[in-house]
Amino acid sequence: MNNYYKPGPVNASAKVHCRIFTAYVDDGKNQQAQGIYGKFYVNGNYFETHEKLSNSQKTELANANADNTSSTAFCVKNNEVSTKDLLVSLRFPILDDYSFVQSAQDAYQSVLLYAGASNLRDKIDKRIVKETQEGTFTYTGSNGGTNGLIDTQADVEGW
């Protein structure tokens, strides 16, 4: 809940431009009965638009922002069950005592202001925040990774 989705260079035009989650029903191979599925509370998530998105993708994105349970935002793999079987309408009470809840937009701003390796941001932290704000990238992979997807930490300044 309340996640902020910002497309980067690699996924701005991908088919997952406004997907929050794809649910899979257990096939019975995970030490439980076949057909078991989870329950989900999906609300307050926000998708930022991107210039590379088509008009139809922007419409889907607007629909996902208006209703996080729309068919493009919350999918069920192979239509094994309906989304109504998976969604709950109220937050789970376990979150009440242990969480600080912000809107997606406020959480995004908090990450830009405070995320990093330590209280004092180093040059890598600063670069990552700048690239996040601008939707850009500096490095590509050494084994085929493009548009900011790296293949190893040696492709960047390390971490």
Please place each PLM-identified region on the residue numbering.
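Long, contiguous C-terminal flanking segments immediately downstream of a protein's structured core
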Residues: Y5-W159
